[in-house]
């Protein structure tokens, strides 16, 4: 459905994790009517979709769509294949190369879906919570990638060619540390107990505490002198530090 002249709709990619939830909060704070897009892509940590539902309900988004695409058909990642998730890696090691948790072309696939929905809604804005500081070295989280995709998007769409709408991809977290991201979210009232970040959760959905995503999350809470409110394996929660 097209939007009214006074309504600003945005597509926000929402995984259910810490970064995407903060991004959703930022989009709403900037006055956008949010349509949230999540993906069931055969991920090892499918429990994140329950977190995405909790988050989008808490923020009362206009609509939440969970698109289904089975990337297990290709594999090639610890998140979609029978490859072990790296544990207890140092921050230096995380930044030294592209890890096996990288899902080939995932953000390109996700942003393409977001672009298609944005055209239908006549929305000019897409938000994605990529980060190029405290991250695991994924190539599709870099500023130059986002810039290139935005250029492509405006060349590849009816609205872009006709000049009736210019798409902007917003990356409000791209230059923030994990600690800064958490502080921004807390200032906006985000309840991080609703979120899920772990790549290798237990059968009960508890975070492992040792994968890259958990370690970066714990680092962010420690930087704020706070305890992470989610449950970890072997403990009710994980204290800062």
Curated annotation (Swiss-Prot):
Cofactor(s) the protein requires to work: Zn(2+)
InterPro entries noted in UniProt: QueC, Rossmann-like_a/b/a_fold
Role summary: Catalyzes the ATP-dependent conversion of 7-carboxy-7-deazaguanine (CDG) to 7-cyano-7-deazaguanine (preQ(0)).
Database matches in NCBIfam families: 7-cyano-7-deazaguanine synthase QueC
Descriptive protein name: 7-cyano-7-deazaguanine synthase
EC primary class: ligase
A GO term, aspect molecular function: ligase activity, forming carbon-nitrogen bonds
């Amino acid at each position: 459905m097209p939007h009214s002249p006074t309504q600003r709709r945005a597509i926000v990619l929402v995984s259910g994790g810490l970064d995407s939830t903060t991004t959703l909060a930022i989009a709403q704070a900037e006055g956008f009517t949010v349509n949230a897009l999540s993906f069931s892509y055969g991920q090892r940590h499918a429990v994140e979709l329950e977190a995405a539902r909790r988050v989008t309900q808490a923020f009362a988004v206009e609509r939440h769509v969970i698109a289904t695409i089975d990337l297990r058909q290709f594999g090639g990642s610890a998140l979609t294949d029978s490859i072990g998730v790296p544990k207890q890696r140092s921050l230096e090691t995380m930044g030294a190369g592209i890890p096996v948790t990288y899902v080939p072309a995932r953000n390109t696939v996700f942003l393409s879906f977001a672009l298609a929905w944005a055209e239908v809604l006549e929305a000019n804005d897409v938000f994605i919570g990529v980060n190029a500081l405290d991250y695991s070295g994924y190539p599709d989280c870099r500023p130059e990638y986002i810039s290139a995709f935005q250029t492509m998007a405006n060349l590849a769409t009816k609205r872009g060619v006709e000049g009736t709408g210019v798409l902007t991809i917003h990356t409000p977290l791209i230059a923030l540390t994990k600690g800064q991201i958490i502080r921004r979210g807390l200032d906006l009232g985000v309840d991080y107990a609703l979120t899920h970040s772990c790549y290798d959760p237990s059968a009960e959905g508890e975070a492992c505490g040792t994968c890259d995503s958990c370690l970066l999350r714990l680092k962010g809470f420690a930087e704020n002198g706070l305890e992470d409110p989610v449950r970890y394996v072997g403990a009710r929660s994980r204290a800062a530090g």
